[in-house]
Swiss-Prot record:
Fe cation binds at C106, H148, H152. This is Peptide deformylase. CDD domains: Pep_deformylase (cd00487). One of its GO terms (biological process) is translation. It is an enzyme of class 3 (hydrolase). Its cofactor is Fe(2+). InterPro entries: Peptide_deformylase (IPR023635), Peptide_deformylase_sf (IPR036821). Belongs to the polypeptide deformylase family. The keyword Zinc-finger does not apply.
Amino acid sequence: MAVVPIRIVGDPVLHTPTQPVPVGDDGSLPADLGKLIADMYDTMDAAHGVGLAANQIGVGLRVFVYDCADDRGLTERRRGVVVNPVLETSEIPETMPDPDTDDEGCLSVPGESFPTGRASWARVTGLDADGNPVSIEGHGLFARMLQHETGHLDGFLYLDRLIGRYARSAKRAVKSHNWGVPGLSWMPGEGPDPFGH
């Protein structure tokens, strides 16, 4: 359908919990949801992302798309959409994240990445694009993506989970880019790729 701008940290839509997608009495989803999902896929693909939440493109609905390997370095990927996701995870470690294995980035924090503590396993249940029940789960990178995208839908960025020196580094990065204010976005496919793809 269309590649659309991705909102940058500081935009209120990223820091506000999303609303559930309305489901009809017959289990049907809104007719215009298909266009939103297509735009989300196009935008995620153009940005070379592994996931994208609706509020990252300015739509406050509880839906995300993904195209993610089960773990780093693997070429086989899983691709899909989850509407009205509910997240379940294993325990999140209370130790400092490892900068070599726990690095995480975000399309709404373009070009930056920071070690982030996440559960090693996660499952999301919800609906697919046709309103059918869906349950997806995984370990490693896939689990990280599930937690990251549902976090967006709850009104949080991964920066909100950072601790210690990583949180301080992220605050400096946001300030140095003049982010943290409403109205900023970037357009995948235009200009240099902030992630170097």
